[in-house]
Design a protein with these regions (language model features):
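TPR alpha-solenoid repeat register
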Residues: 24, 69-72
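Canonical positions in the second alpha-helix
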Residues: 13-14, 60
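Short coil/turn linking the two alpha-helices of tandem helical-hairpin repeats
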Residues: 1, 29, 34-44, 81-89
């Protein structure tokens, strides 16, 4: 299994060097998602990680809206689903986008 703390740290360093790379932003968001999914008892800590991931994934979406470089859509969908719930407009928008793939 990957060490998600190490992954997050490495991608944070990469984002500090170049915060406009949608691939790095997507991998950072994905790593934060994975780390959050391992938290079972602390819902606030889990939500904080999903929210942090969301920021990076939304930035990747801004930089690469057509997903030509990075596939940020599914991890962003996961964040929206787990933070805002299934019927939130943001979640539904990502779900629709994923079905168009």
């Amino acid at each position: 299994n990957p060490n998600w703390d190490e992954c997050v740290t490495a991608f944070q360093k990469a984002v500090a060097i170049d915060g406009t790379n949608p691939v790095v932003l997507t991998y950072l968001g994905f790593s934060l998602n994975a780390k959050a999914s391992l938290i079972n008892k602390d819902r606030a800590a889990q939500k904080a990680l999903y929210t942090e991931a969301m920021g990076h994934l939304e930035r990747a979406k801004e930089l690469d809206p057509n997903r030509e470089k990075a596939n940020w859509a599914y991890p962003l969908y996961q964040c929206y689903y787990l933070v805002y719930a299934a019927n939130d407009p943001r979640t539904l928008e990502m779900e629709k986008l994923l079905k168009q793939q």
